[in-house]
């Protein structure tokens, strides 16, 4: 626990962690498996590429999604359109790679629980998000959870 004095009153620091939990502990039990993504941007000199903002692909292509940005931003530009194709690959922790999605299998959950137990020993330390909690969240659920955590921390502070 970190305490500090601010204008004569004691204050307890609370930490919320949103990064990969295995990396916080230097992968001492092994690396948690994640799916990463490579993004390939392409520009086309035509009004539209696919007619929709996002099209998901399951098995027909090597990429999993194409996003055409003009439909997300409301652009009226008719001189061209830009898309991005998302290609999945296994996250290895190499420089420049980003872990995006937990690979939710029982053996991976068991490994996560080891790291979770280590984090549980840290006072006033809160895990939040896809990487720290090793689960998938939609943005609306994640926003709600973050606000609930903030409320809980504020309520805890008023008890002190």
Predicted regions, residues:
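Single conserved hydrophobic/aromatic residue that forms the stacking wall/gate
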Residues: 1-13
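Short glycine/serine/threonine-biased micro-segments
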Residues: 6, 17, 127
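Glycine-/small-residue-rich beta->alpha transition segments that form the dinucleotide
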Residues: 14, 18-23
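C-terminal segments that line or cap access tunnels to active or ligand-binding sites in enzymes
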Residues: 23-159
């Amino acid at each position: 626990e970190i305490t500090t004095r601010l204008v004569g009153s004691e204050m307890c620091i609370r930490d919320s962690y949103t990064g990969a939990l295995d990396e916080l502990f230097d992968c001492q039990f092994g690396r948690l498996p994640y799916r990463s993504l490579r993004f390939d941007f392409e520009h086309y000199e035509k009004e539209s590429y696919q007619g929709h903002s996002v099209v998901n692909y399951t098995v027909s292509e090597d990429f999993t999604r194409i996003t055409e940005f003009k439909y997300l931003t409301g652009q009226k530009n008719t001189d061209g359109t830009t898309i991005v194709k998302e290609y999945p690959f296994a996250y290895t922790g190499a420089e420049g790679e980003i872990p995006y999605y937990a690979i939710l299998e029982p053996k991976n959950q068991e490994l996560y629980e080891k790291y979770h137990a280590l984090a549980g020993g840290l006072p006033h330390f809160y895990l939040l998000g896809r990487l720290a909690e090793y689960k998938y969240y939609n943005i609306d659920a994640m926003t709600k959870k973050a606000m609930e955590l903030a409320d809980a921390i504020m309520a805890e502070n008023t008890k002190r």
